[in-house]
Amino acid sequence: MFKDFFNRSSKKKKYVTVSDSKQSDVPAGIMTKCPKCKKIMYTKELAENLNVCFNCDHHIALTAHNRIEAISDEGTFTEFDKGMTSANPLDFPSYEEKIQKDQQKTGLNEAVVTGTAQLDGMTFGVAVMDARFRMGSMGSVLGEKICRIIEHCTENRLPFILFSASGGARMQEGIISLMQMGKTSVSLKRHADAGLLYISYITNPTTGGVSASFASVGDINISEPKALIGFAGRRVIEQTINEKLPDDFQTAEFLLEHGQLDKVVHRKEMKATLSNILKMHQEVKTNA
């Protein structure tokens, strides 16, 4: 089995099966286990494949910066508001410690990275949520950063792309967290009133208050295959309505079938799809 770890031949499989009891034998960072099919792959080769599993095609989460790198021209990204970090407005116990722990783990100050970049020479504003930080939960700083990049796009007449990945509102900030739903939606309404494009790219998972606000109101709503998208949890809904839900309920494919998404896009087609949309938008704006 261990020969397969070091055999780089293209004719060999790029993964091996490792039992749960043997996971500790795999050096940290060198190998990555697919959360879906449990196959073990070289982290470097997986990254080159945009974190798409070679075996089952599962779309493993990308970091915010890796996502931006995958959709933009090299060296064109300029980050905004990098130093903004959450306070503890409600004096919630241990909240500061949890924030600091996630900052050390991820290298981020918040659960979203915002800025401007170019794709095939076209400038756009972008916000990418990173679920490694507080599960991408929506707090006051996340809402403020998103509003600021939207306002920048509106003022400079730029299209805006937002990649969502979130467990919902951040409970440690209470009503202040919930206020971000309305706050971001108002900024997006102003952007729309200016006749500007907003692309919502919903990734796995996007739930709770994020799915009920800015993630669902794009001019064009896109998602990745099998992404979990919903408000309340499956069990909560089943217990509330006392009915069994379809197996594919709250998946991107289910939402596409029911008209809540415009397209489900494989990650390898993500950059080309966004480029085509931006080009069409530019042509419409030029001819208007």
Curated annotation (Swiss-Prot):
Write out the pathway annotation from the protein's UniProt entry.
Answer: Lipid metabolism; malonyl-CoA biosynthesis; malonyl-CoA from acetyl-CoA: step 1/1
Domain CoA carboxyltransferase N-terminal: residue ranges: 30-288
According to its UniProt entry, the protein's GO biological process terms are: fatty acid biosynthetic process; malonyl-CoA biosynthetic process
- For the keyword ATP-binding, the answer is yes
**Keyword Cytoplasm appears in the UniProt entry:** yes
> Entry's PROSITE patterns?
COA_CT_NTER
User: What EC number(s) has UniProt assigned to this enzyme?
Assistant: 2.1.3.15
Q: What is its main location?
A: cytoplasm
Q: Which reaction does it catalyse?
A: N(6)-carboxybiotinyl-L-lysyl-[protein] + acetyl-CoA = N(6)-biotinyl-L-lysyl-[protein] + malonyl-CoA
Q: What does this protein do?
A: Component of the acetyl coenzyme A carboxylase (ACC) complex. Biotin carboxylase (BC) catalyzes the carboxylation of biotin on its carrier protein (BCCP) and then the CO(2) group is transferred by the transcarboxylase to acetyl-CoA to form malonyl-CoA.
Summary of subunit composition and partner proteins: Acetyl-CoA carboxylase is a heterohexamer composed of biotin carboxyl carrier protein (AccB), biotin carboxylase (AccC) and two subunits each of ACCase subunit alpha (AccA) and ACCase subunit beta (AccD).
Report the protein name in the record: Acetyl-coenzyme A carboxylase carboxyl transferase subunit beta
Organism taxonomic ancestry = Bacteria, Bacillati, Bacillota, Bacilli, Bacillales
